[in-house]
Amino acid sequence: MSEVADKVKKIVVEHLGVEESKVTPEASFIDDLGADSLDTVELVMAFEEAFGVEIPEDAAEKISTVKDAVEYIEKQKAA
């Protein structure tokens, strides 16, 4: 698992209060981890702060799984 993936996982565990074992790449924030729409906004803000990236609203709407978040952040950091 990449450094970005580890950090995303840690943020999700802290913000949603879920067990680390449930935070898999395919885990949906809403369907699998019990997040609501406010939780997803807070997660996006936490990702932005933790990684120093900007995630516009249109991109944030497409981030629904742990893998989506990791891929988006890695792409932004590489740019």
Swiss-Prot record:
Nucleotide-binding keyword on record: no
- Please name one Pfam family that this protein belongs to: PP-binding
Q: Name one GO cellular component term.
A: membrane
Give all residue intervals belonging to the Carrier domain: 2-77
GO molecular function per UniProt: acyl binding; acyl carrier activity
GO BP terms in the entry: lipid A biosynthetic process
> Does Ribosomal protein count among this protein's keywords?
no
Q: Which SUPFAM superfamilies match?
A: ACP-like (SSF47336)
Keywords from the named record: Cytoplasm, Fatty acid biosynthesis, Fatty acid metabolism, Lipid biosynthesis, Lipid metabolism, Phosphopantetheine, Phosphoprotein
Please outline how this chain is modified post-translation. 4'-phosphopantetheine is transferred from CoA to a specific serine of apo-ACP by AcpS. This modification is essential for activity because fatty acids are bound in thioester linkage to the sulfhydryl of the prosthetic group.
Q: Give compartment(s).
A: Cytoplasm
To which pathway does this protein belong?
A: Lipid metabolism; fatty acid biosynthesis
Top-level taxon: Bacteria
Q: Which residues carry this modification: O-(pantetheine 4'-phosphoryl)serine?
A: 37
What this chain does, per the record?
Answer: Carrier of the growing fatty acid chain in fatty acid biosynthesis.
Family of this protein: Belongs to the acyl carrier protein (ACP) family.
What name is this protein filed under?
A: Acyl carrier protein
What organism, scientifically named, is this protein from?
Answer: Granulibacter bethesdensis (strain ATCC BAA-1260 / CGDNIH1)
